[in-house]
Amino acid sequence: MKKFLAFLLAVLALTFVACGKDKDIESYLDMERINSEFNIEKQDNEQIKFTDKDESRSAYRIFNFQKMKSVDFKNPKKIDKLEEFYLGKNCDIIYKDESTIIVLVLAQDNSYAYNIQNFDDSKTELMIAVSIGSDKELSEDELFNLLDEAKSFLK
């Protein structure tokens, strides 16, 4: 009887894990808030991309959430590969740790473009990206606030 119960619990646990992996991306996000505050540019089961409704903001934001394959998510060199890519494009690395990279992509004529990429496994294996176009230079704290805002969309 114990073996049967243990087997049943194992099957239920595997079913729960499998169900979590098969959920649509929107099941992890506050879609009501996103729909009310942003324009959804692209959406499918694996990713969603949304932008500010107010295009005249001083810091225009594009948010992108994407489910990743486990093998790619668990790659310990994913941030290093991103850093190498950005450095190859002559971008400035503002911040980097094991799960986040913040990059100044362009600074020209009082226009600044930033990319923030974060890998989050609190709900599922997600890549969170925020692209920012700004008419002023943003501080590291302001950029982290934008990352926090992106994470606030997670349920």
PLM regions: where:
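Positively charged n-region of N-terminal signal peptides that target proteins for export
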Residues: 1-4
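N-terminal "mature-domain start" segment
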Residues: 20-54, 85, 147-153
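Repetitive helical segments and hydrophobic/amphipathic motifs
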Residues: 11-12
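Surface-exposed amphipathic alpha-helical segments
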Residues: 130-155
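Short, solvent-exposed coil/turn segments at beta-strand boundaries
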Residues: 31-36, 53-56, 66, 96-100, ...
